[in-house]
Amino acid sequence: MRAWDAQRVAAAAGASLLRGPAAGERGPVYAAVDSRSAGPGDLFVGLRGDRVDGGRFAAAALTAGAWGVLVEPAHASAAVAATGAGAVLAADNPLTALWRLATAWRRDLGATVIGVTGSTGKTSTKDLLGAVLSPARRTVTSRANFNTEIGVPLQILAAPQGTEVLVLEMAMRGAGQIALLARIAEPDVGVIVSIGPVHLEQLGSLEAIASAKAELVAALAPSATAVLPAGERLLEPHLRTDVKTLTFGPDGDVRLVAQHGESVEIDAQGEHLTLTVNFDEAHLRHDLLAAVAAAIAIGVRPAGKIELVRAPGRGLRRLLPRGVTLIDDAYNANPMSMRAALDALAVTPAQGRRVAVLGDMLELGPEAGRYHREIGAYANGIADLLVSVGPLAAAMAVTFRGEHQLVADAATAAALLDEILSPGDVVLVKGSNGVGLKLICEKLLA
């Protein structure tokens, strides 16, 4: 937003400009909702939360050198009286003002916007899109967790002038949330990576989950493109005839032909592509096909080496000093991603045992027991030892036929692993965030 002056920022947000910045001051560099991260030149947006009213910190942000603040009228007087030369903008609802500002900046950028959602795989697809597109276009992708009604507008506002493609991850916790994110971002391409049993506790059925994800398709303009998994029955009621659709996966417009080591062969609407990748997991090949389809939708022909940079908690492999390989996939879990993680464990070379440390999968509703038993059965033939963490994960022992240990929490699991792991072992750690299995990885790496 550096090219915008304070008057334009206020007008775009639908806010009142109560105090201007220093004469000749350009627009803000970034927007932030945490005053501690609102540095000099940034716009601090004071949001009212369940426990904290961010507007109370507006004066401190100005004193610290913020370009300006956007607050409720109740905090405007204190902000105007604060030291510093920053702008003060007031709006009845700073959050909706943030949304309006983001949409205005998105339109001014002129970038192609790709929205990515899915029950699993949206983060890796977003990252793969960045790797696919960056050699051909100036591409910006969502930062970690900038995928909510707060994170998406902040990510849009962080995109600098000259951005050609903006790839936005879109998360949801219930119906209506993807529709909101799409209204803010106005995507040119909407990608649904997968549909699966996630947030069942809130939505109740797979059909309801598909409907919530398909809000992205419903929001697309007629000139936009939907990128969808081929043959996904749950999405059939939500297909549109007035929007171009590209499918990926078996029998899709973009499909895998073969993988030989790091070389992947893809058929993209009859065109043969050969890419070099740094992964061999089946679920990542699926995500790669989604990324390739989205790239083709905006006229980019993927080529060369596509390198996925894995983040901690998202399948990152590390060799521990004791000679144990850790697969850190502790960020989150659902039945689809749990199977994918076990597949990754299966293809990881091991001189010793393959150990699966699996925690509760939360928010699965009344069918939680069944889903956990299915994971226990799936682990047969993959894991030599299964360590279940938490009361729900205990159900995995019912169907797992190998050696099994049940522990109550992450700390106990970490202590157990410290005793039993041997050089050459491979250990997978995965569970829902609420179980806190990140602690296990931290202990193993210490």
Regions found by a protein language model. Name each.
Residues 95-230, 234-242, 419, 443-446:
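Phosphate-binding loop of NTP-binding sites
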Residues 49-52, 56-59, 311-313, 322, ...:
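Active-site beta-alpha connecting loops in nucleotide-dependent enzymes
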Residues 10-13, 75-80, 191-325, 351-352, ...:
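Acidic, Mg2+-coordinating active-site environments of NTP-dependent enzymes
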Residues 9, 42, 61, 101, ...:
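Residue-level signal for inorganic ion chemistry
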Residues 116, 122, 312-317, 438-442:
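ATP-dependent carboxylate/acyl-activation modules
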Residues 1-117, 124-135, 150, 157, ...:
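Short, basic phosphate-binding NTP loop
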Residues 65, 82-84, 135, 185-186, ...:
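Short, structured coil segments at secondary-structure junctions
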Residues 117, 417-445:
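A glycine-rich beta-strand to alpha-helix segment
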